[in-house]
Amino acid sequence: MPQLDKFTYFTQFFWSCLFLFTFYIAICNDGDGLLGISRILKLRNQLLSHRTNNIRSKDPNSLEDILRKGFSTGLSYMYSSLFEDSQWCKAVDLLGKRRKITLISCFGEISGSRGMERNIFYLISKSSYSTSSNPGWGITCRNDIMLIHVPHGQGSIGF
């Protein structure tokens, strides 16, 4: 970079400041510019804070109901998706047996039973609720609650 004298430096500084401040004012004074975005974000945060204050409940039974509904929805989704996958695998296996090739013998199965679900719900209901500075959603998870699905019975895949 060339060495500039003070006068040349000043003119470049002046024109760059004038150019940047002109665009800054044009952007910020526009209703859709930066100030408009900040107003929208402030309004959104206010609406979300009002909504979360109405939703929060200090009743541990309602939190337990939410957990139960969430787990039952997740389990039913898991059962239905694995059932559909198993049906697909059986259809592909039947098609392969007609052609005397084994494509997929089995996708996997759920080795747990409904008793396992009851045991999980029992452990969740026994879990302790925290009473810290965050009232409402302060639930501490127990370390001994863990649900792992490991598909087994995976057959050979041949192409």
From Swiss-Prot:
Top EC class of this enzyme: translocase
Membrane-crossing segments per the record: 10-28
GO biological process entries: ATP biosynthetic process; proton transmembrane transport
Gene Ontology MF annotations: ATP binding
Membrane topology of the entry: Single-pass membrane protein
One of the record's GO cellular component terms: mitochondrial membrane
Annotated catalysed reactions: ATP + H2O + 4 H(+)(in) = ADP + phosphate + 5 H(+)(out)
Domain of life the protein comes from: Eukaryota
Protein's UniProt keywords contain Transit peptide: no
InterPro entries according to UniProt: YMF19, YMF19-like, YMF19-like_N
Keywords: ATP synthesis, ATP-binding, CF(0), Hydrogen ion transport, Ion transport, Membrane, Mitochondrion, Nucleotide-binding, Translocase, Transmembrane, Transmembrane helix, Transport
EC number per UniProt: 7.1.2.2
Compartments (UniProt record): Mitochondrion membrane
Function statement: This is one of the chains of the nonenzymatic component (CF(0) subunit) of the mitochondrial ATPase complex.
Subunit description: F-type ATPases have 2 components, CF(1) - the catalytic core - and CF(0) - the membrane proton channel. CF(1) has five subunits: alpha(3), beta(3), gamma(1), delta(1), epsilon(1). CF(0) has three main subunits: a, b and c.
Stated family: Belongs to the ATPase protein YMF19 family.
Protein name stated in the entry: Putative ATP synthase protein YMF19
Organism: Helianthus annuus
